[in-house]
Amino acid sequence: MFAAEHTVEVYKQPGRFAGWPANHGIWSWGNEIVVGFESGYFHVRRPGEHEHSIDYKQPAEHLLARSLDGGETWQIEEPLGLLAPPGTKVAGVPTEAGGKPVADCPGGFDFTNPDFMVTFRMADVDIGPSRFYCSLNRGKSWQGPFRVPLFGQKGIAARTDYLVNGRSDLTVFLTAAKSNGHEGRVICVRTQDGGKTWSFVSFVTPEPEGRDYAIMPSSVRLPSHAILTAVRYQNWIDLYRSDDNARTWAYVGRPAPDTENPPSLLQLQDGRLALTYGRRSAPFGIRARLSSDEGKTWSSEIVLRNDGGCWDLGYTRSVQRPDGKIVTVYYFNDSPDHERQIAVTIWNPGLETHRKTEK
């Protein structure tokens, strides 16, 4: 049986819009969990306006939330090292002053350091530019911002999705602008010198037509060394697989056909996969699915929450605790006219057997 055991409030402030953990990233070390998110000013939208309820004229903070007890309680941190470069907007939202200019990365980072973190950030959702920051002490201090190359593309709109291959070797999944300059399609890139130089590896997805997009990847490496990458499309999530270390990709299936939200793909301790995402059509909320065959088939949808006030929610990121429970972080609302908050659902993924759905 799958049980959403309880929900925890991480960050909720009157008059604030807190959102988009999927853009920033999540990391865990046993029961210590760190997740990034953005906090701007709340702005009520008129009926029929399909825009986020954030004030696009006032600056937003880029924050971290840290839990030392498996997601039961949280402390909010505002690291100065994550301030955006001067004059930068993030997805159209101004940022706080005080950040450093973007520089070239000197390289030399040890990605196998157990306390290492890297977070990727963008300016514009279509063409970027993008940057990254590195921490060697679980997010207490940061180095950067460092420049993300264009890799021959018209733009890069980076979020945080990466796989550590070795001490100086990191594979990163990014969203590139399409040939028409709009978002986007997923690409794979790699550094083998600790972040100093980068090379283009592959396109993960075909290029969508017109204003359609394939963005916001979430990736895992299986015990077989194959890589699975879940990708957000307009209203659904598709899954791709590589068996040659990200050089070529094959379409696997569509695990979530109705989302309007990015995926968070997680490999569980027992080898299964967990996919979490927000649902932006009624009933609004947070959902999950499980797979025990490397993503070929998936369970029926698991309802973690169905009490959302409107579509403006989701962007999940999930980790598994040592006791096997899953901690799913997301942004949420209980009414279109109320602030957006960061919340957590702690849930039990149950036994290995589950009902399967078609690809």
Name these PLM-found stretches:
Residues 1-359:
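Asp-box/BNR beta-propeller blade signature and adjacent active/binding-site loops
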